[in-house]
Amino acid sequence: MDSSSEKLSPFELMSAILKGAKLDGSNSSDSGVAVSPAVMAMLLENKELVMILTTSVAVLIGCVVVLIWRRSSGSGKKVVEPPKLIVPKSVVEPEEIDEGKKKFTIFFGTQTGTAEGFAKALAEEAKARYEKAVIKVIDIDDYAADDEEYEEKFRKETLAFFILATYGDGEPTDNAARFYKWFVEGNDRGDWLKNLQYGVFGLGNRQYEHFNKIAKVVDEKVAEQGGKRIVPLVLGDDDQCIEDDFAAWRENVWPELDNLLRDEDDTTVSTTYTAAIPEYRVVFPDKSDSLISEANGHANGYANGNTVYDAQHPCRSNVAVRKELHTPASDRSCTHLDFDIAGTGLSYGTGDHVGVYCDNLSETVEEAERLLNLPPETYFSLHADKEDGTPLAGSSLPPPFPPCTLRTALTRYADLLNTPKKSALLALAAYASDPNEADRLKYLASPAGKDEYAQSLVANQRSLLEVMAEFPSAKPPLGVFFAAIAPRLQPRFYSISSSPRMAPSRIHVTCALVYEKTPGGRIHKGVCSTWMKNAIPLEESRDCSWAPIFVRQSNFKLPADPKVPVIMIGPGTGLAPFRGFLQERLALKEEGAELGTAVFFFGCRNRKMDYIYEDELNHFLEIGALSELLVAFSREGPTKQYVQHKMAEKASDIWRMISDGAYVYVCGDAKGMARDVHRTLHTIAQEQGSMDSTQAEGFVKNLQMTGRYLRDVW
């Protein structure tokens, strides 16, 4: 390089470029600014840097031009606001209603989907009857983001129906809990619902003491706050045929809606309505394109790595420990299971419930495949819309599960062992090639066949597979089978039998095996209890069993003050939450807390067969986490003894503890034990407290209302 050549700074080069200097030494008479030979030489010497700078200038000029163009082209438009934050719940947005159109809203509170199905069925028939009406079906939890919005929106409602299930011992369903708390416990609003006409249908089970409590309370509260009831409250009983109860209530609805919604020129209300059979659109894709979906897919997804776990987003959890709790002398079985939640972010509280999704037994799945007459490797996907993306007719289809084989679908997603609903019988009838079988199915689903359906199917606990075997010509397509015949397999709930103070990375479950002969003669094997009994724990194999699980919070909690005395009553697997309670008390004691008296009434058949967790209970007793343990053995000695008998023997002690502020907890069977314990508690209050029957009843009810008498029953 010539020693006389100079290096230009970027600034000097840029100045030269902007003045129009040419690098090829062309005649200065061309458009441009003349530059001296020295400058030209310097530019040529720094040619690479010049190219970088010229490119940068071109890009800069281009950006400026685009900005000017966009600003000028948008000058006459409204400024776009930044998007709002995403709200976890999809709150229903208000929609504009054409003037002159009448509207009503159907709210549902559901745990297993039945109430939602009823709400959508009511809406579909109403749309067919009243073409000019605007009808909305709303998950009551999605109606509003907060209490203030609930009140604001309800004030605008003029016609509404509430289809509400009661869950457990008089509790609202998960999706109705927030609404129920606001509506029942809120401030006195006077007759703020005076413009609302309404009706309520409840879903419950008469075997529970607080039968249909949620529907009763909502119906009463709406009336108290000015609402006008246009149809009587009907309490559906799932212990019988709740479809018949809903059908009867629905028939009361139509005359009232005719008066409110029918126009003089509206003739649609007089036409006979026939409900369409729900059906998914089915696609049979190339399985090789979806192997990942088949391996990892689940109807509800998995939420590992996220912060929110619920029934729709469960947490995949390995089985860490499994052990049998009964002795070899027992002819029954009870399984203890540890779910490993370390590193998942899933947490729980003492007294909470765990929901577990389990697979159907292979023998059950194989029978279903045989009845459907389809190969198990059939790979398909379900869709609730048409190919062009528009929704299929009707709106009662539940969200479809991911693409999978028929075997996977029947294993994970189909409830095959419960008694089929009448709507399922009608769907089977529509695809029965034998006219006699079709007629028989239609009869069982009809009002005329009500008694025979109740006796032949419900009372005998006939399963869906048994019914399909009885009517072999019924071969529904997959879209109908999964939409209208086989309900979605539901999670099983268990009282958690551990405390996070003692087992922060494990959820313990105590599960009795369900293995019994039905009245119809079939051997019924519980889906989840059988799976748990056969689960392979991590301590035995790295290829261990796992299940999608989630935690459901409960109000079944120890008093905030550990010095408050507690009375616990729970025979059999009713011991589960109390094992967690005692672990909690032990941890508190080890931390130096002062504990109040704790008495536990436990019951089992025989000390040598089914006295579960005996060593642990004795340890809690010895170390002081438990003050007194009273065990009733129903199969030892000449007479059967149950927990209520032990309670009667300790009546004076129980009354003294209650008088000192004790909390009373009951866990176990709702149909027998819980009722007997409740009656015994009533008797103790009456006799020990010198009360008459009415006073004793009021006393026990007050214990419940103040949260000192809590039940976890099933």
UniProtKB/Swiss-Prot annotation:
All copies of domain FAD-binding FR-type, residue ranges: 312-559
Positions on the Cytoplasmic side per record topology: 70-714
Cofactor(s) annotated in UniProt: FAD; FMN
Family, as annotated: Belongs to the NADPH--cytochrome P450 reductase family. In the N-terminal section; belongs to the flavodoxin family.
Keyword NAD: no
Topology in membrane: Single-pass membrane protein
Sequence positions that bind FAD: 492-495, 510-512, 526-529, 714
Protein known as: NADPH--cytochrome P450 reductase
Lumenal-side positions: 1-48
HAMAP family documented for this protein: NCPR
Domain Flavodoxin-like: 104-254
Gene3D superfamilies reported in the protein's UniProt record: 3.40.50.360, NADPH-cytochrome p450 Reductase, Chain A, domain 3 (1.20.990.10), Nucleotide-binding domain of ferredoxin-NADP reductase (FNR) module (3.40.50.80), Translation factors (2.40.30.10)
Main location: endoplasmic reticulum
Enzyme class: oxidoreductase
GO molecular function: flavin adenine dinucleotide binding; FMN binding; NADP binding; NADPH-hemoprotein reductase activity
Biological role: This enzyme is required for electron transfer from NADP to cytochrome P450 in microsomes. It can also provide electron transfer to heme oxygenase and cytochrome B5.
Transmembrane segments: 49-69
Residues noted as binding FMN in the record, renumbered to the chain: 110-115, 165-168, 203-212, 238
Reactions performed catalytically: 2 oxidized [cytochrome P450] + NADPH = 2 reduced [cytochrome P450] + NADP(+) + H(+)
Keyword entries, A-Z: Endoplasmic reticulum, FAD, Flavoprotein, FMN, Membrane, NADP, Oxidoreductase, Transmembrane, Transmembrane helix
Binding, NADP(+): 332, 573, 634-635, 640-644, 676
CC cofactor note: Binds 1 FAD per monomer.
Catalytic activity, EC: 1.6.2.4
Cellular localization per UniProt: Endoplasmic reticulum membrane
